[in-house]
Amino acid sequence: MTTRYIFVTGGVVSSLGKGIAAASLAAILEARGLNVTIMKLDPYINVDPGTMSPTQHGEVFVTEDGAETDLDLGHYERFIRTKMNRRNNFTTGRIYEEVLRKERRGDYLGATIQVIPHITNAIKEKVLAGGEGHDVAIVEIGGTVGDIESLPFLESIRQLGVELGRDRTLFMHLTLVPFLGAAGEVKTKPTQHSVKELRSIGIAPDVLVCRGDRAIPANEKAKISLFCNVEERAVISLKDVDSIYKIPALLKAQGLDQLVTKRFGIDCKEADLAEWEKVVYQEANPVGEVTIGMVGKYIELPDAYKSVNEALKHAGLFNRVSVNIKYIDSQNVEAKGDEVLQGLDGILVPGGFGERGVEGKIMAAKFARENNLPYFGICLGMQVALIEFARHVAGLEGAHSTEFKPETPHPVVGLITEWINEDGQVEERHEESDLGGTMRLGAQLCHLEEGTKAAAAYKSTTCVERHRHRYEVNNNYKERLEKAGLIFSGLSSDRSLVEMIELPNHPWFVAGQFHPEFTSTPRDGQPLFEGFVAAAAAYQKRDLED
């Protein structure tokens, strides 16, 4: 199979939405029957984002094969059917690590190691490997043209453009075309300078996607085409929209997919975007609204919970309600108590690390349990629910996790020392293990107990979800907790680890050790999120009737 490559770069400013634009183009090409994948090349020195602060980098998206990756890979999976893996995301740090490891082994036979050719060759090898087996591979280059950090990646794709030829490569550049209120017009000069910078390093863009708060007038498109040496039909206007799921239709309406297929000489059917039209319609026409309180510690940056936010919205689509997310700092719960939890239709406690704010999350779980308020716990959200139950229902005073209180008299949650990974191999960890790349990661089979809310949600006695954690329920306390009324509704593939818990006499108190948000998409939803939002809508209805 001959793979064609589309390289996506960004200029003028960061956060233009290269990932969304790349994913939207991929969605159109997929709708034309093509097998598409997307890669993200990140210019930072970290080996992966696994140990980076969520408040700086946003969430860490976990792939099926256990790679800790950039949040853009979540966008990719939400827009196309292709599942991402560790080949879809790599960093400058990983490239340097692998090159230096080869140098230490003597693989380079004493050669002087340089950015060109050794680093650039390593980048090219990874790009080509990531595209294998696909009709089209879209490659997003992180950062902004002009950044020092991005230069090795840009040089690598320049070389690939020469080596693969024009019939297998296309360069798409996103820029900002701002509107100046004082002048009453859009300004194209930043785009001209960005393209000039890109051309100075040997890359001539074939397509310009111009971002702005409004559509670019035809005369300004012609001006951009003239000064940037790009065909006028290849100057694409991408204005701000109220839903990212409208973007595939916007790009298709301007013929971007036809431009791509013509360039690559691909003969394929027209794109049918009916599924996306349905998503946009559902999003614009809810019949109700629910308010979900998300109790976390990284709420100053909503991108820290990007996949959770999107999964709640997807669940709203399937329940025909708009989901209003109220972000609640768990430390505020500690300081102010129940008053910050009033007026909610459900509480969700997402994953997280570190002791700060943990007691507030435990208090939120207690509030939901005692008030029959729908509760959904994810990863740490399951652990705090179990700790709360152990303390206040099972009579285990002082119960805690050894992550936060090693000397706790009742360590109901402790470090996982051994488990079966996604390949069926036994992995082991201990307290002295490195933080990076040492968690239980990736897709794992979970056995669901018949008759539970979990099994009802999945309509099955098994599910496969992705994990990212070091701590688990201490099996020594399972019998005591079960006698107190807690249901262990999900167990690991070998039934040695607790994966899900729930309460029997509660409208919806369900929690999982895994991260179901990573498998939610706007077209397919996700069973647990759908069940949770349905329970929130039912709670609101009962509350109004009372």
Curated annotation (Swiss-Prot):
User: Could you say which residues bind Mg(2+) here?
Assistant: D72, E140
Question: What single Pfam family name could you report for this chain, choosing any that match?
Answer: CTP_synth_N
Q: Does the keyword ATP-binding apply?
A: yes
Regulation of catalytic or functional activity: Allosterically activated by GTP, when glutamine is the substrate; GTP has no effect on the reaction when ammonia is the substrate. The allosteric effector GTP functions by stabilizing the protein conformation that binds the tetrahedral intermediate(s) formed during glutamine hydrolysis. Inhibited by the product CTP, via allosteric rather than competitive inhibition.
Example GO molecular function: metal ion binding
Q: Which reaction does it catalyse?
A: UTP + L-glutamine + ATP + H2O = CTP + L-glutamate + ADP + phosphate + 2 H(+); L-glutamine + H2O = L-glutamate + NH4(+); UTP + NH4(+) + ATP = CTP + ADP + phosphate + 2 H(+)
Biological process according to GO: 'de novo' CTP biosynthetic process; pyrimidine nucleobase biosynthetic process
Q: Which residues does the UniProt record annotate as the domain Glutamine amidotransferase type-1? A: 291-542
Against CDD domains, the record matches this protein to:
CTPS_N, GATase1_CTP_Synthase
Q: Where does L-glutamine bind?
A: G352, L380, G381, M382, Q383, E403, R470
What positions does UniProt annotate as the active site of this protein? C379 (nucleophile), H515, E517
Gene Ontology CC entries for this record: cytosol
Task: Please list the residues that bind UTP.
Answer: S14, K187, T188, K189, P190, T191, Q192, K223
EC number of this enzyme? 6.3.4.2
Kindly list the positions annotated as binding ATP. Answer: S15, L16, G17, K18, G19, I20, D72, K239, D240, V241
Question: Where do the record's region annotations for Amidoligase domain lie?
Answer: 1-266
Q: What is the protein's known function?
A: Catalyzes the ATP-dependent amination of UTP to CTP with either L-glutamine or ammonia as the source of nitrogen. Regulates intracellular CTP levels through interactions with the four ribonucleotide triphosphates.
Quote additional remarks. Answer: CTPSs have evolved a hybrid strategy for distinguishing between UTP and CTP. The overlapping regions of the product feedback inhibitory and substrate sites recognize a common feature in both compounds, the triphosphate moiety. To differentiate isosteric substrate and product pyrimidine rings, an additional pocket far from the expected kinase/ligase catalytic site, specifically recognizes the cytosine and ribose portions of the product inhibitor.
On subunit structure and binding partners, the annotation says: Homotetramer.
Q: What's the name of the protein?
A: CTP synthase
* Biological classification of the source: Bacteria, Pseudomonadati, Pseudomonadota, Gammaproteobacteria, Alteromonadales
| Name of the encoding gene | pyrG
